[in-house]
Amino acid sequence: MALTTPLSITAIVPAAGVGSRMKADRPKQYLLLNGKTVLEHTIEQLLAFPLVNKVVVAITDGDPYFPELTLAQDNRVIRVSGGKERADSVLSGLSYVQEHQLSEWVMVHDAARPCVRHSDIDKLITEVIPEHIGGILASPVRDTMKQATQEQCIETTIDRSVLWHALTPQLFTTELLYSALQTGLDKNLSITDESSAIELMGYQPKLVQGRADNLKITQPEDLDLAEFYLQKMKKETK
């Protein structure tokens, strides 16, 4: 890593979602992968990265699953109340980070992305700090992209050379991201990820190319693929 000054980063994991598309008996972050929940894999991967000091996880009040996890007793894992929308949950985490002065920088990571690699996190940090106000991991679109009509017919083909899939982590300064999210929520703006809130303030976050296998579990078939990737990552670290 090219950074020469000491750096500490807090990871924020919004984990208050229901994940209805999984059609499971519990939220997708609590489904099992290789004997552990998806959330455990995700948080453990973040905690194992040297620059991450704490993981602030936003959980729905009354969540019956999180307290049963071993990592719930880890003093590096901080639980805060999650909100109705992703932005509310992230803002709750940011409030804790600011109140306790945990770090100048935060990175927000999806609870359902357990396959993020340390090499990608390292690349994100190295390319974003200190030259940019923030940035995200992203993957270039490889497929031909079609714009559809309301009747689901093809209206036109979109130039994919300028399109990227937004991934996580997304890395920003604590103060800027808090201000962006709070402003967006106050104005009832559409905030789909942290970067979109920053963009609405007129900034252009850095795109850092990450691996496409940093998948987000959203469909039942994603579990098998995530399990394969996790096993592959484990073999590569031996």
From Swiss-Prot:
EC number: 2.7.7.60
GO biological process terms held by the UniProt record: isopentenyl diphosphate biosynthetic process, methylerythritol 4-phosphate pathway
Record pathway: Isoprenoid biosynthesis; isopentenyl diphosphate biosynthesis via DXP pathway; isopentenyl diphosphate from 1-deoxy-D-xylulose 5-phosphate: step 2/6
Site (Transition state stabilizer): 21, 28
Keywords for the protein's UniProt record, in alphabetical order: Isoprene biosynthesis, Nucleotidyltransferase, Transferase
Pfam families xrefs: IspD
Keyword Transferase: yes
Disulfide bonds: none
Recorded superkingdom: Bacteria
Keyword Cell cycle recorded: no
Reaction catalyzed: 2-C-methyl-D-erythritol 4-phosphate + CTP + H(+) = 4-CDP-2-C-methyl-D-erythritol + diphosphate
Function: Catalyzes the formation of 4-diphosphocytidyl-2-C-methyl-D-erythritol from CTP and 2-C-methyl-D-erythritol 4-phosphate (MEP).
Protein name: 2-C-methyl-D-erythritol 4-phosphate cytidylyltransferase
Species this chain originates from: Aliivibrio fischeri (strain MJ11)
Gene that produces this protein: ispD
